[in-house]
């Protein structure tokens, strides 16, 4: 059995790490490199960096900090932000990233997933999915350009359909960003995770809602996710990664201890 992964998420805007609630009202957390170094030292299994306004601004992630992060950590990390071509991806990987993640650009050009997977291998290609539960329709819908609330829009895709589509096109991993739960620390949306797990054959990462160690346990035990991503509980030092992993191990979760 593969070990479950604990993944701190660092949302980047204007060269700094920020954090919002339900993808809105972002506050500055701190500088990118020191936070990355801290999480690696605490025992994170990997890191994910999202340049949250790159796609909506029509630009690619700032590669200068990617190289600086690669110099100070010895764990895998994934970078997302405005990657629209194999050339964009190649540059980010050449600066030291282990994976690249695409989200809004994949919705605009689904064939991009296949082009990237063919060139770099599926193990390198992560697709992020920003999913919102609509009370009016009772369905989960995929959103686009969520890094800028003034430009965020609901797409024509229902979440389960898009999950299946990106797998067909070559996604090697899926990060499910559950927008309703983001930043509120009330737990992951287990119902949605179970539905997605039923149709997801590639590694699946839960994102949005972690507030306690028990929330991580529930995601692993009840929804069988491969990794749990979180931000505010780590940024604000509500949960220590080493202590979290020790707790999960005592609960029978296969985890890499620090």
UniProtKB/Swiss-Prot annotation:
Name recorded for this polypeptide: Imidazole glycerol phosphate synthase subunit HisF
Catalytic reaction annotation: 5-[(5-phospho-1-deoxy-D-ribulos-1-ylimino)methylamino]-1-(5-phospho-beta-D-ribosyl)imidazole-4-carboxamide + L-glutamine = D-erythro-1-(imidazol-4-yl)glycerol 3-phosphate + 5-amino-1-(5-phospho-beta-D-ribosyl)imidazole-4-carboxamide + L-glutamate + H(+)
Species of the source = Enterobacter sp. (strain 638)
Gene Ontology, cellular component aspect: cytoplasm
Which protein family is named in the record? Belongs to the HisA/HisF family.
Q: Could you tell me which NCBIfam families the record lists for this protein?
A: hisF
One Gene Ontology term of the biological-process aspect is: L-histidine biosynthetic process
Say yes or no: keyword Oxidoreductase present. no
Q: Which HAMAP family match?
A: HisF
């Amino acid at each position: 059995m593969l070990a479950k992964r604990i993944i701190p998420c660092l949302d980047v805007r204007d060269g700094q790490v920020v954090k919002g609630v339900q993808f809105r009202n972002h506050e500055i957390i701190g500088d990118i490199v020191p936070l990355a170094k801290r999480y690696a030292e605490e025992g994170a299994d990997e890191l994910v960096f999202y340049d949250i306004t790159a796609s909506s601004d029509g630009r690619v992630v700032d590669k200068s900090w990617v190289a600086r992060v690669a110099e100070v950590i010895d764990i895998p990390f994934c970078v997302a932000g405005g990657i629209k071509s194999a050339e964009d991806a190649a540059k980010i990987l050449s600066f030291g990233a282990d994976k690249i993640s695409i989200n809004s650009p994949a919705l605009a050009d689904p064939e991009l997933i296949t082009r990237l997977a063919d060139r770099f291998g599926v193990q390198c290609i992560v697709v992020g999915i920003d999913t919102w539960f609509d009370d009016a329709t009772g369905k989960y819908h995929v959103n686009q350009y969520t890094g800028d609330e003034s430009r965020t829009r609901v797409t024509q895709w229902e979440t389960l359909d898009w999950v299946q589509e990106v797998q067909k096109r070559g996604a090697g991993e899926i990060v499910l960003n559950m927008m309703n739960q983001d930043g509120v620390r009330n737990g992951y949306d287990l119902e949605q995770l179970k539905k997605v797990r039923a149709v997801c054959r590639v590694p699946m990462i839960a994102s949005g809602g972690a507030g306690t160690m028990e929330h991580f346990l529930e995601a692993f035990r009840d929804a069988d996710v491969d990794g749990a991503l979180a931000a505010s509980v780590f940024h604000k030092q509500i949960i220590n990664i080493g202590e979290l992993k020790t707790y999960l191990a005592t609960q029978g979760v296969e985890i890499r201890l620090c």
